[in-house]
């Protein structure tokens, strides 16, 4: 039985970063938060149901009723703490590309969960582990939502008691470049191309590279090229995104640590410094790859942010803190 709580007048603002999952060898384990953001404003309204206004990416395309992914994430969070969902008014300002492997679905889920956490402040407390569990309930893969929640580099794993994460601070020299194509890619299609099993030696190869990649990202960026080699998933998906595969091959041949971003088709290039990032962007430009939008992004270290006290957000005086 859900209890009714008076949340009249409450409003909350949320800001969630883009993410890149896998990072080459870290399939379903590693994720990186990137400084490109979706922003959300949620207010409680007297009327039941939800209204949604979407601005920016997804405007005119994503649902604007209770079936909206953000609304569903809010509802899931309220239900998890036994509180009835009030009427809601949502305004979303999106800049994370959809269907490009930059975590747009995960960002929507995290936006909703964090908005619910803000609205429920003083009513129900949800700790970091609880936030990850709620997000994983909806997304299904914690590596996709952990960096959006907590920022930085995250290692995610699943135990019998639920998903877990470890956040690490990335070396200040690491300079991500994301190359975004015009076409989209279905995550479900990308996963369907994965084999049921892989050779033992390929698994060993990826274990070594994943361990090396963590060290490269937090301590030794000069090892990024060697550390981003992969034999578990990218080659199996190449047939579904040949342009991505060709550009990654070109970049890696020229010494750049290029990998598929998430499920693709975007490419993440992990550069050891801003100069190398500029060189990678210039190489892509010389190939006539005009269809690829280069995004020179910083690593986001905060993750999702939300006002400290929900009521303060009404007057715009809320103190913004990370999870």
Curated annotation (Swiss-Prot):
Catalyzed reactions: L-homoserine + ATP = O-phospho-L-homoserine + ADP + H(+)
Binding site for ATP: 97-107
Location relative to the cell: Cytoplasm
Source superkingdom: Bacteria
UniProt keyword terms in alphabetical order: Amino-acid biosynthesis, ATP-binding, Cytoplasm, Kinase, Nucleotide-binding, Threonine biosynthesis, Transferase
Enzyme class: transferase
UniProt EC number: 2.7.1.39
Pathway(s) served: Amino-acid biosynthesis; L-threonine biosynthesis; L-threonine from L-aspartate: step 4/5
Matching InterPro entries: GHMP_kinase_C_dom, GHMP_kinase_C_sf, GHMP_kinase_N_dom, GHMP_knse_ATP-bd_CS, Homoserine_kinase, Ribosomal_Su5_D2-typ_SF, Ribsml_uS5_D2-typ_fold_subgr
Molecular function terms from GO: ATP binding; homoserine kinase activity
Keyword Cytoplasm in record: yes
GO biological-process terms attached to the record: threonine biosynthetic process
Main location: cytoplasm
GO cellular component, one term: cytoplasm
UniProt similarity note: Belongs to the GHMP kinase family. Homoserine kinase subfamily.
Function of the protein: Catalyzes the ATP-dependent phosphorylation of L-homoserine to L-homoserine phosphate.
Protein name per the record: Homoserine kinase
Species this chain originates from: Leifsonia xyli subsp. xyli (strain CTCB07)
Gene field: thrB
